[in-house]
Design a protein with these regions (language model features):
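Interaction-interface detector
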Residues: 2-144
């Protein structure tokens, strides 16, 4: 959790939960028979938070950003989801080996996508710049 000043000068609490990884079962309990039957998967953050349980910590009116250890964005919810009550639903993300942060929806560019071309840095979403080597590899991959 981090606190940032919004445009109106008011401090607001934002979630930034880091490094989710797949686990067999939540540490605070074993799998239920129903979870075994359907083959349920679980994620746990580096500070021990269960993915399903910590989703309630995120605000319904903030954009959600899923990013890797280098800050590259691979998932984003920057528009309300009609199937989730027109909220910015963090449940749309599945952050295996990723972190999830929230920012004010107005601070998330409309054209931001989870395609690796954007970065999450210091609480902000910015267009990614590529090194010459990354550009060469990208061009080679597009030839295939």
């Amino acid at each position: 959790m981090v606190y940032r000043t919004r445009g109106n000068g008011i401090m607001k609490k934002y979630q930034d939960i880091k490094n989710f990884r797949l686990i067999d079962a939540p540490v605070n309990r074993g799998k239920t028979q129903a979870e075994i039957n359907i083959g349920a998967y679980f994620l746990e953050s580096e500070d021990g938070q269960d993915w399903y349980e910590c989703q309630s910590l995120f605000s319904d009116d903030t954009a959600k950003i899923m990013y890797d250890p280098e800050g590259v964005i691979w998932g984003v919810v920057n528009k309300p989801v009609p199937q989730r009550g027109n909220t910015y639903a963090v449940s749309m993300l599945w952050p295996v080996n990723m972190s999830v942060a929230e920012i004010d929806a107005a601070d998330c560019p409309d054209d931001c996508r989870g395609d690796g071309t954007w970065l999450y840095q210091d609480g902000k979403v910015v267009q990614r710049g590529y090194s010459p080597e990354e550009l060469r590899k990208k061009a080679e991959a597009e030839k295939i």
